[in-house]
């Protein structure tokens, strides 16, 4: 069954909702954004997450030192890296890694050392999907996440199109820029039970 990552959580209530609804991954954004949390805030929120739900830290062009500090302080299970990725960034990390790839039309999939790939829209967090026809995942070495403009109305179609390891959502479960607990529940319900949306 396709796994679900709910990203950009910053409150106890949102974390508890995502966990109780059946999220497999909880994402904390450490890169500058409206969803950014500090290591200290994430460490407190991480206490609410059971061990079978994986904690993911989201970074943009980080150093290895930054990753190691966050892994240690927050107890991250995975790091997700956007932007520049040094050749040795993922070597011998004490947790698993996800490299984000912006799908921008050239169809290029990097030769990555990461454990997972995540395919996202050209502007991450924008709520806009990428053109699914521009991505060919045939023969990929790694399991992959699909992100970029997913919501309760299109996520089942995305799963049918790509058969991904997991789907990732942030703005698609928000209302007016805040996490919407009902949208979180409905999104996870759609993924887990294959209930198509209205569009």
Curated annotation (Swiss-Prot):
It catalyses: N-(5-phospho-beta-D-ribosyl)anthranilate = 1-(2-carboxyphenylamino)-1-deoxy-D-ribulose 5-phosphate. SUPFAM superfamilies: Ribulose-phoshate binding barrel. GO terms for molecular function: phosphoribosylanthranilate isomerase activity. Keywords: Amino-acid biosynthesis, Aromatic amino acid biosynthesis, Isomerase, Tryptophan biosynthesis. GO terms for biological process: L-tryptophan biosynthetic process. Pathway: Amino-acid biosynthesis; L-tryptophan biosynthesis; L-tryptophan from chorismate: step 3/5. Its EC number is 5.3.1.24. Belongs to the TrpF family. This is N-(5'-phosphoribosyl)anthranilate isomerase.
